Amino acid sequence: MNHSSIEVANKQGFAYAIGAALLFSCKPIIIKWAYSYGIDALSLMLLRMILALPVYLLIGTIIIRKRNIKLPAKHWLSAAFVGLFGYYLATLLDLKGLELANAQLERIILYAYPTLVVVLGAIIFKHKVTKQQIGALVLCYAGIICIFLQDLSLQGKQVIEGSLLILLSALSYAIYMLFSKKHIDRLGSLLFTCISMTSATFATIIHTSIALSYGELNPNEWVLSNELMAIVLLLTFAATIVPSFMISEAVSRIGAANAALTGTVGPIMTSIMAVALLGEIFTLHHGIGMVLVILGVSRLKPKTIPEQKQPEKKQTAEGSQ
């Protein structure tokens, strides 16, 4: 692959990452709409996963048959295990946190995960942290902290609990991002995403079954109306299926750290939608925080990514059709 081809792949990777961030930024807004109909976090997660499962199973089956993939069981199990961090544990903690915190705060805290990806990568894999990354992170998270402290002073103790849950969600997602690269290189981004979402769905089904058996979940407390079903469908396709494939494609091109850093634009879009659609408060602190985040993102420039292998290129082209 020549230099121009690498630059094209690099730009495509950042485009996928930004697109995924924008779609993911809609997620807390949609979830808040769903909560207004009385549904709980685990039930919402189950509906979302079950609706998405057929899509991932279909795409995964097509890829396996077309590429005639034959790998040891340990590779499949390892990919499924990593997927649990990104699409089961991180999602569950995030949904639980959103029951207590508002949409703007959720998106701000969740975007601590780029820092965690960079730090964990440096500690575990000895990845180099550039001065540009450090400077960008300082600006971004100065803005994040500014907004966080403002919301914390306005809403009280429940925000603390919600924030902790969402912070744990960010940590779980950072682990997923960090360990997903080798599986994407081995399986391809689309197939790995299918495996991850499938394993997360079955984990959610098991969790729900246990919760029902212990009386911790009462489905009679909410009604699956046409309006709620429409919201769940929107959450499933616009804020789950499409961005999950896009972020995997981004990681396969530019790596976990760069994909994570680019996604920092998410809080800005969430704040705009939260104010416009949910009526959340937007103060001077929020404005200052958003400016700092924008300045931080502006310092992030694409890095030259390693040359891609030809099989992965073919698989990526199939996924873009």
PLM segments and residue spans:
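Hydrophobic alpha-helical transmembrane segments of multi-pass integral membrane proteins
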Residues: K11-A15, L42-I62, F81, Q132, ...
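Membrane-interface helix termini and inter-helical loops of multi-pass transporters
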Residues: I29-Y37, L98-E99, F148-V159, A211-E227, ...
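Hydrophobic transmembrane alpha-helices of multi-pass small-molecule transport proteins
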Residues: Y56, L120, V129-D151, T264, ...
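Specific alpha-helical transmembrane segments that line the substrate/conduction pathway
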Residues: S43-P54, T91-K128, Q133-I134, S169, ...
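Specific transmembrane alpha-helical segments of multi-pass solute transporters/efflux pumps
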Residues: L23, P28, L57-L110, C146, ...
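Helix-helix packing/entry segments at the starts of transmembrane helices
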Residues: A21, L47, L105-A112, M177-F202, ...
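Glycine-/small-residue-enriched transmembrane alpha-helix faces in small-molecule transporters
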Residues: M1-L47, Q155-K182, F202, I206, ...
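Hydrophobic/small/kink-forming positions within alpha-helical transmembrane segments
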Residues: S25, G83-Y88, L92, T115-V119, ...
